[in-house]
Amino acid sequence: MRLNQTLWSTFLTLSAIVLLASCSSNGSKTSRNSGASDVDPQKFGAVYQGRSYQQAILAPVNQVENKSAVINQGDFLAQLSNIHSYSGKLSSNFAPIYDKVTAWVLAGANVNELNNFGIHSQVMKGFDGYQNVLMTGYYSPVIHARRTQQGKYNQPIYALPSQKRFSRAEIYAGALKGKGLELAYSDSMIDNFLLGVQGSGYVDFGEGNLNYFAYAGQNGYPYAAVGRLLVEDGEIPKEKMSIQAIRDWANANPSRVQGLLERNPSYVFFKNDPNGKVKGAAGVPLVPMASVASDRGVIPLGSVLLVEVPQIDNEGNWTGEHKLHLMVALDVGGAVNGHHFDLYRGIGDQAGHIAGLSKHYGRVWVLR
């Protein structure tokens, strides 16, 4: 799937969510649906009361049933601005709906008035036929590091070598040491690993600004999901698996971390792009909670979506609420299939925490 840097970054980002958090045993990426199927989906925001089974993937509706306010109008307009600046193709192809939705937003974004602006809505079938679309999350991590090895900062982040066919274990054993490939040294082997799984992220050198580390390549070895390994080993119950659970296990078992990670021979290399921005497969910088990764066979890149986002607390429990967000489909991933969206949560630990807990359900309306 090495189409370009962005797409591979997305591929690995989504693997973080699906393969770490849901512990899927399938080869590359599978729907995180399997992670929530062992329990009642209603505990994760799925709703059935008052709904009829829907056969069509997308069904036109006269009105959006959720009457709550859209809460991210400003972020959505910022996302559209990024599209206009970075993608003439999407701007041109979707100009009519972008213009209509912009006018609707500026007029107050009342869902009862969509038809007044010539906006037509189609509701997605959902994984179950009752409009319950699976929603996971991804984010951009921030790694604390130094430019040279010093004290606790002794875990290297490598640039792409000319000879990259070394396994993770060989790299940990020093196969790349002294070749001038060290971009940074962090203080955490598990943080470096998760940066590799995300495929890109930010590095804080303690100099007052963040440096973007973009995906540069991979060593050619297959990816093994460490979350699945921890479940199989009996270390973490499947229903408790999340990125945070992996971090907690690593903090409690520092002497075992390297052995676990070496069971995943895949290794990702980076390049320093100080002025870089987090972009999706469409090549457009992403605005948190105004952009999603989708299955482009169902939802083409550039599509405008009204998303009923399930609200969760800091432990990942659904609060009983959904809130409406306007979003644009700007990313893809092999793990995002059918009625499954991956919501971009933003930068840093809190964004990562919520992303790692997200495996909930809500409705999605495609606006045309």
For every predicted segment, state its role.
Residues 2-11:
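Bacterial N-terminal signal peptides that target proteins for export
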Residues 20-22:
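C-terminal motif of bacterial Sec signal peptides marking the signal peptidase cleavage site
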Residues 24-368:
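Solvent-exposed, well-ordered loop and adjacent helix/strand elements within mature globular domains
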